[in-house]
Amino acid sequence: VSAFLLNRSSDLDLYDAIEEFGKYHHETLKKRLSLQNGIPSHDTINRVFQMINFRQFERIFLEWAEELKPEGTTETVIAIDGKTVRGSRDGYHDNPAIHLVHAWSVENGLCLGQRKTRDKSNEITAIPELLDMLCIEGTIITIDAMGTQTAIAEKIVDDKADYILALKGNQGTLLQDAELMEKEVKPVAESEEVDKGHGRVETRRCAVFEPTEWIWKNHQWKGLRTIVKLTATRWNAISKEEVSETRWYISSLDKDADFIRHIRGHWGVENSLHWVLDMTFGEDQQRRS
């Protein structure tokens, strides 16, 4: 297993390549590993990994990874996000692709845990299991719209954490009510952030609202304190085109929270975690589940 992890860090993924790596670095490896019988063959490596209990392996690996964090560092924002591993689809046996739900430490750039589901719709049941693995007290949990469920919000608050949940059309009339609210009341806080570079200018405007009595009466969300509207506008100086996108969120944080930073941290999962899984660990090419 140690040899496998070293190989993955060296961007090798085939079992015969792992065997060759072990043979090439045999003198170095035997100083730290017990290798009385030498480097195992690629067939042996394959069989060993078929027998591993990956839940236990994950737990041990995460405990080890936790020790790598600098002393005194803590999680502030934990982004929960799902990803379909396209390479896991087995059309011959009619097995769909595996969907993984990850917990990502935004500050530390570390995957804190994951749960496997058969499709994206099962994220709703996987997210509470994933939260149970973690100590989330005092953190901010960010989740996309699939995880915007009253039971999940309640669990986060009960575990003494806060939430920022993406709001789309999957929660009855809550999104429509939020849009109507904007026409009736003024935001209690506003902020703006501008990024320039590569011939583009991106402006992010955040408006924070306190829920109206109508929303309180018709939507039961434990801990709900704010509703957030985030509008991102991108101006391309070369093509002279402007694209604007508006997203809504509900949160247990108060109006003074740095919503732009927290939400951008969640978006960073695509670049930070998913890119590593695809390019370094080759998840979209893996077939073993």
Identify what each model region corresponds to.
Residues 35-93:
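Active-site- or DNA-interface-adjacent structural scaffold in DNA-acting proteins
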Residues 68-161, 168:
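Polybasic low-complexity intrinsically disordered regions
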Residues 14-33:
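DNA-recognition alpha helix
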Residues 254-287:
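Short amphipathic alpha-helical "interface-anchor" segments enriched in bulky aromatics
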Residues 165-264:
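An anionic, glycine-rich sequence signature occurring as long contiguous blocks
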Residues 2-9:
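Short, small-residue-biased leader/transition segments that mark boundaries at the very start
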Residues 239-240, 287-289:
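Structural motif
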Residues 19, 60-63, 75-77, 190-193, ...:
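Short coil/turn segments at secondary-structure boundaries
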